[in-house]
Amino acid sequence: MFAFLLFIAFTSATNIILDLDQEVKDTNIYGVFLKNEASPEKLEEAEEKEKSSSAKPESSSNEDNEDDEDEKASSSDNSESSSSDKPDNKPEASSSDKPEASSSDKPDNKPEASSSDKPDNKPEASSSDKPDNKPEASSSDKPDNKPEASSSDKPDNKPEASSTNKPEASSTNKPEASSTNKPEASSTNKPEASSTSNSNDKSGSSSDNDNNNLDAASSPFIVFCAIIIAIIF
């Protein structure tokens, strides 16, 4: 186990060292130290390269200025030519075409549509349809149905059931049962029931005693089993 841990530590250390070497190469830290140790000849060459690079932007800036001047001159010529051509055509079109179209087409169409179509349709729908339907439904349907149901159905059914069914049942069934069944049962069944009930009571008391003894014997065993099950779970 210890050897396995040493192997893991060694492999992780080697991977970390390799990663550090790659990061150092990417950041060019070694190049900084080499520049400090470079000879003066290399420094002079670097200065000459910087001067040549600075001279190139100056020449490019002069060329850009010349190009800008040429573009400005060409744009001025184009503007003069466009100013000479455009003002001849525009006022004629604006003076001749626009007022005719505005005077002929627009005022003729709009008032006709507004005067003929809109005011005729709306009052008819409002005057004919809406007020006729609502009062009829309110006057005819609702008050007719409710009082009929309340006046006809409810008071008729309840007193009939109370007046017809209850006294008949009380008058017919009860005295017959009291007059026929009770004396016969009292005259015939009591001595036999007394002889049989004594034997049943004795057997029932003996069975109850047996059941009580079984319950008393089995109750500690049940409690012990319940404790064991509770400990297991």
UniProtKB/Swiss-Prot annotation:
Organism for this UniProt entry: Entamoeba histolytica (strain ATCC 30459 / HM-1:IMSS / ABRM)
Cell location: Cell membrane
Region named 6 X 12 AA tandem repeats of S-S-S-D-K-P-D-N-K-P-E-A: 82-161
Bias (Acidic residues): 61-71
Job of this protein: Plays a role in the adhesion to host cells. Involved in the adhesion to host apoptotic cells thereby facilitating their phagocytosis.
Region annotation (4 X 8 AA tandem repeats of S-S-T-N-K-P-E-A) ranges: 162-193
Main location class: membrane
Residue windows of the Sequence repeats: 82-93, 102-113, 114-125, 126-137, 138-149, 150-161, 162-169, 170-177, 178-185, 186-193
Cystine pairings recorded for this chain: none
Skewed-composition ranges (Low complexity): 193-219
Keywords tagged on the record: Cell adhesion, Cell membrane, Glycoprotein, Lipoprotein, Membrane, Palmitate, Phosphoprotein, Repeat
An annotated GO cellular component: extrinsic component of external side of plasma membrane
Ranges of compositional bias, category Polar residues: 160-192
Gene Ontology BP terms: adhesion of symbiont to host; cell adhesion
Biased composition (Basic and acidic residues): 38-53, 83-159
Protein name in UniProt: Serine-rich 25 kDa antigen protein
Modification after translation, per record: Phosphorylated on serine residue(s).
Signal peptide: none
